[in-house]
């Protein structure tokens, strides 16, 4: 491989390092896409890998299982990420064993998710009744279960550990020392970032989590960030070594999330019938866990503000809130229903449980707009899924949403969470069919730049580099010890 200086300062052999920027692994230009519309403008392309693929990976996901339904409890975008990545790693002949906490008595110890991917349930604490915030007290039991599972294997069974979220990173830190393999870590969310952008009345993340994240950042061989924004947070807020931070953008299942064939208006009507939504008028959908961080209340308040601004338009709009309570939202599971009643817009708000199978793409196609008003997102898979279905997104201009949505191309980014500002954006977009059609076309083009196949290709580069560097350190140590 030719030595060169990356445009953003990646350390390559024999080259001076720019410590102010991480690596961005950019996608190649999608077939038929406009180069000017590519979401990532920096990075480097690689030829054949100069290192072997890892044979087997231990994936750690303490607090949530990829088998759980996204949109309920603690299951969300991270579940989708782990599931989609594991499937495609198996297709690339890399075995994946996912370790997660057992949460029900009827769960088998091991589930084969697809050939080459196994989910192993680790007994650690009570099966039910523990919140994510209470799980640090069970990390010792979980770690013991992981180490015992590996102890019956032949030495060198795993080539690498990939931990997800800080709880798993703590387990991975110990396992990497015990097994003598590199640790790759993806944070998915960061306490310091969440605490800097708290919703009103939401609980701040505890100091113990901040300390735990700092420890994992210091110990991981590679840190995978979803976007350049998250990479910057790791470097600036957690003092991560930029040469160990790699940006690998998540993807979307373009076969599942795609525009309906045929006439769009007819397809929208059919999707609304499927979900028992009004066939006429406008539909604005929120999809996600019901918790202050995701800010579904901002959308409901915006609907009420729109009624003050344009009563006729507001009465022609239905807000759909799709998801289940999670996190601090569990403390007030009926809060949004009560809020809609207090604002006098109960007749304009519909609540749906998390959607599975073909019903989730149908919901995106049924909507005229999908709203993502979160206070923070490391990426925002919902925004990407909606755009892949050809539905423009109105999103808060925070975190990874600045990457997931291209402002005025695939949707609209709103500064802040003022319901009046959100009502203004909705009021401008909904009646303007021409502008929404333009954004719908841009949304499809933008989403085509993301795929899980590309994500896994880039992750394999990260894995290979981590394994190669680890083996070099071992070789150097052995040489020095002679």
From Swiss-Prot:
Enzyme class: transferase
GO BP: mycothiol biosynthetic process
CDD domains found in the cross-reference section: GT4_sucrose_synthase
Source domain of life: Bacteria
Catalysed transformations (reactions): 1D-myo-inositol 3-phosphate + UDP-N-acetyl-alpha-D-glucosamine = 1D-myo-inositol 2-acetamido-2-deoxy-alpha-D-glucopyranoside 3-phosphate + UDP + H(+)
GO terms, molecular function: acetylglucosaminyltransferase activity; D-inositol-3-phosphate glycosyltransferase activity; magnesium ion binding
Residue sites binding UDP-N-acetyl-alpha-D-glucosamine per the record: 69-70, 77, 289, 294, 355, 377, 385
Positions that bind 1D-myo-inositol 3-phosphate: 63, 74-79, 132, 165, 189, 209
SUPFAM superfamilies with a match to the protein in the record: UDP-Glycosyltransferase/glycogen phosphorylase
InterPro entries: Glyco_trans_1, Glyco_trans_4-like_N, Mycothiol_biosynthesis_MshA
Binding of Mg(2+), residues: 364-365, 367, 391
Family: Belongs to the glycosyltransferase group 1 family. MshA subfamily.
Role according to the record: Catalyzes the transfer of a N-acetyl-glucosamine moiety to 1D-myo-inositol 3-phosphate to produce 1D-myo-inositol 2-acetamido-2-deoxy-glucopyranoside 3-phosphate in the mycothiol biosynthesis pathway.
Protein name: D-inositol 3-phosphate glycosyltransferase
